[in-house]
């Protein structure tokens, strides 16, 4: 190939990779980061390939988050030395917390950005490349509601939808409010419009996201953009029924088959939400409600604003209205000052609650939180021993609850990446309406004509029904023939490699796109 012909070839876009740590909010923020970069001219790096830009979207909830980030950054240092044109960006909660300290610990990083200004990433990358100097930009308040940003969705069949950002609670163990700011809620019309956009692209399931979803309505944004003073939102009086109304409105969206939400706070959980869950067919019979501790004394020290009796009362009312609801929770073991009596109270509430599963954590001291300075910090050995006892109890309950599902017929939304052993076992995986993970045999459905069975391969995004044949603490098994198989637009999109996109973009196409690199071919070397 001649040099003239080589120069005539289209430029090669630089590639990116986003590495995500932490909660569902971070996962969704990473979709936005991907959307921003793609709008700016980057393309996603192939699996296993070295990306030109590596973005870390970090978590600051637990102490090992720091170690994980800086360990991974150190692994990239040799590559950065040999390929100075590659770029490394660090964003998210840990970046918001550490700020300039990121560069002190990892001076080869090119960009540091916070939770309030993720839309700045393409511009910061361009500025760092142009100036050949690291860029640190941490905003103190939200600059634009994140959902206005473009998002490159990971799933063709299920989508995250933020209904709020920030949190007004003051839990003594939690650093999130200081990093994410006060709660600001999206207007219902904006939330529903985003859901409709996803459904129009084939999405069957949405999960409504917020730090405290049942506080929704506390501070509606008057506009998706901040006014001149970034610390102020024009707001309207709180609507305490707003979240239940939003759930019912989701039920009126044609084509939306499943609605989930995470996470509600027990202190503000009201019966109108239970009624909306029970009376809205597409709201899934699943509730994730953090308990944290079963001890009233520890709950008070945590500033959780509820007590064990209130929590158990909510569970009783949910199960009365939705008998098949699967209830899951979060638990912290070893909070400062926790006695054996306090821990036993947690075991008692767990035993009474019969959670289908629980995310259980050993207390992690976070600088900047009130709990970090409390007396009575427990020895690691004590915390570890209690943690093991709690795990043993919850594993037994989870197994018993799953064994009760054997023989039931479940509808599954077929998923990808849920079963680590699917290839070895010749199974696929999917989620039941109550959120349980089911590994199933993908044999032809009994209701399909023979002529269609070869064509109707089960795909992620399709919907099947099957009968549960076995159980383990964390999943169900369904090894019989499928009872039904419904091909969906989501399955078509997944098979075609299409991903839904949402967001209005920044209005500045190409910002952050680096100068194109020339194509090299074997003939041009």
Curated annotation (Swiss-Prot):
<feature type="domain" description="Radical SAM core">
    <location>
        <begin position="153"/>
        <end position="400"/>
    </location>
</feature>
<protein>
    <recommendedName>
        <fullName>tRNA-2-methylthio-N(6)-dimethylallyladenosine synthase</fullName>
        <ecNumber>2.8.4.3</ecNumber>
    </recommendedName>
</protein>
<dbReference type="InterPro" id="IPR002792">
    <property type="entry name" value="TRAM_dom"/>
</dbReference>
<dbReference type="InterPro" id="IPR005839">
    <property type="entry name" value="Methylthiotransferase"/>
</dbReference>
<feature type="binding site">
    <location>
        <position position="174"/>
    </location>
    <ligand>
        <name>[4Fe-4S] cluster 2</name>
    </ligand>
</feature>
<keyword id="KW-0949">S-adenosyl-L-methionine</keyword>
<feature type="binding site">
    <location>
        <position position="167"/>
    </location>
    <ligand>
        <name>[4Fe-4S] cluster 2</name>
    </ligand>
</feature>
<feature type="binding site">
    <location>
        <position position="23"/>
    </location>
    <ligand>
        <name>[4Fe-4S] cluster 1</name>
    </ligand>
</feature>
<dbReference type="GO" id="GO:0051539">
    <property type="term" value="F:4 iron, 4 sulfur cluster binding"/>
</dbReference>
<keyword id="KW-0819">tRNA processing</keyword>
<dbReference type="InterPro" id="IPR038135">
    <property type="entry name" value="Methylthiotransferase_N_sf"/>
</dbReference>
<dbReference type="InterPro" id="IPR007197">
    <property type="entry name" value="rSAM"/>
</dbReference>
<dbReference type="InterPro" id="IPR023404">
    <property type="entry name" value="rSAM_horseshoe"/>
</dbReference>
<keyword id="KW-0004">4Fe-4S</keyword>
<keyword id="KW-0408">Iron</keyword>
<comment type="function">
    <text>Catalyzes the methylthiolation of N6-(dimethylallyl)adenosine (i(6)A), leading to the formation of 2-methylthio-N6-(dimethylallyl)adenosine (ms(2)i(6)A) at position 37 in tRNAs that read codons beginning with uridine.</text>
</comment>
<dbReference type="InterPro" id="IPR006463">
    <property type="entry name" value="MiaB_methiolase"/>
</dbReference>
<dbReference type="GO" id="GO:0005829">
    <property type="term" value="C:cytosol"/>
</dbReference>
<feature type="binding site">
    <location>
        <position position="59"/>
    </location>
    <ligand>
        <name>[4Fe-4S] cluster 1</name>
    </ligand>
</feature>
<feature type="domain" description="TRAM">
    <location>
        <begin position="403"/>
        <end position="482"/>
    </location>
</feature>
<feature type="domain" description="MTTase N-terminal">
    <location>
        <begin position="14"/>
        <end position="130"/>
    </location>
</feature>
<dbReference type="GO" id="GO:0046872">
    <property type="term" value="F:metal ion binding"/>
</dbReference>
<feature type="binding site">
    <location>
        <position position="93"/>
    </location>
    <ligand>
        <name>[4Fe-4S] cluster 1</name>
    </ligand>
</feature>
<dbReference type="Pfam" id="PF04055">
    <property type="entry name" value="Radical_SAM"/>
</dbReference>
<keyword id="KW-0963">Cytoplasm</keyword>
<keyword id="KW-0808">Transferase</keyword>
<keyword id="KW-0411">Iron-sulfur</keyword>
<dbReference type="InterPro" id="IPR013848">
    <property type="entry name" value="Methylthiotransferase_N"/>
</dbReference>
<dbReference type="GO" id="GO:0035597">
    <property type="term" value="F:N6-isopentenyladenosine methylthiotransferase activity"/>
</dbReference>
<comment type="similarity">
    <text>Belongs to the methylthiotransferase family. MiaB subfamily.</text>
</comment>
<dbReference type="InterPro" id="IPR020612">
    <property type="entry name" value="Methylthiotransferase_CS"/>
</dbReference>
<keyword id="KW-0479">Metal-binding</keyword>
<dbReference type="Pfam" id="PF00919">
    <property type="entry name" value="UPF0004"/>
</dbReference>
<dbReference type="InterPro" id="IPR006638">
    <property type="entry name" value="Elp3/MiaA/NifB-like_rSAM"/>
</dbReference>
<comment type="subunit">
    <text>Monomer.</text>
</comment>
<feature type="binding site">
    <location>
        <position position="171"/>
    </location>
    <ligand>
        <name>[4Fe-4S] cluster 2</name>
    </ligand>
</feature>
